[in-house]
């Protein structure tokens, strides 16, 4: 019998509990993320693309750690790319609209810092079902991580109510997390 999948809330509680002590963990946890239309994350040409799993590229797992410098009740997290020194951040575009940017940054350095790093932070908010959540920008609170309805398009930011998809499945796929000795 296959073990029952954890809810997003359970996954996040485990994450925040494990990373309570900033010196306890030596690497982020890996999560599989896919939108409610079954599009998974792929890193291609320096962009994070949402596409069906049968895509020709390898699925990009997301490195995740909590941001303990913001209000923990809102479940702030940093999202990076597993096995890469790249992290998602929200910045203003030349049109003064928030945009999603992937920057070179060590997610564990952000985690260990005492700075808030709101531009790098997303609030993981249960929406939809117990198995889905949305990721709200901490720097731009009305903006959410999103995918296009069309496959093979880059992830971005949008406001709630837009025609884009803001609900994601979020599943920890890390092997036993390592504690520093």
Regions found by a protein language model. Give the residues of each.
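Lectin-like carbohydrate-binding module/patch detector with strong preference for beta-trefoil
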Residues: 1-181
């Amino acid at each position: 019998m296959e073990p029952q999948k954890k809810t997003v809330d359970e996954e996040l509680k485990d994450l925040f509990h494990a990373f309570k002590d900033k010196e306890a963990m030596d690497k982020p946890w890996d999560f599989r993320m896919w939108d409610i239309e079954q599009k998974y994350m792929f890193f291609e040409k320096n962009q994070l693309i949402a596409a069906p799993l049968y895509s020709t590229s390898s699925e990009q797992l997301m490195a995740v750690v909590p941001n303990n410098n913001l209000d923990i009740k809102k479940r702030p997290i940093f999202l990076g790319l597993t096995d890469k020194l790249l992290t998602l951040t929200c910045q203003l575009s030349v049109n003064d609209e928030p945009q999603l940017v992937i920057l070179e940054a060590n997610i564990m350095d952000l985690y260990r810092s005492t700075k808030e790093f709101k531009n790098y932070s997303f609030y993981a908010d249960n929406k939809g079902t117990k198995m889905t959540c949305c990721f709200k920008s901490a720097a731009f609170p009305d903006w959410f991580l999103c995918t296009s309805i069309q496959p093979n398009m880059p992830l971005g930011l949008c406001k709630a109510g837009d025609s884009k998809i803001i609900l994601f499945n979020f599943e920890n796929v890390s092997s036993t997390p390592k504690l520093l000795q």
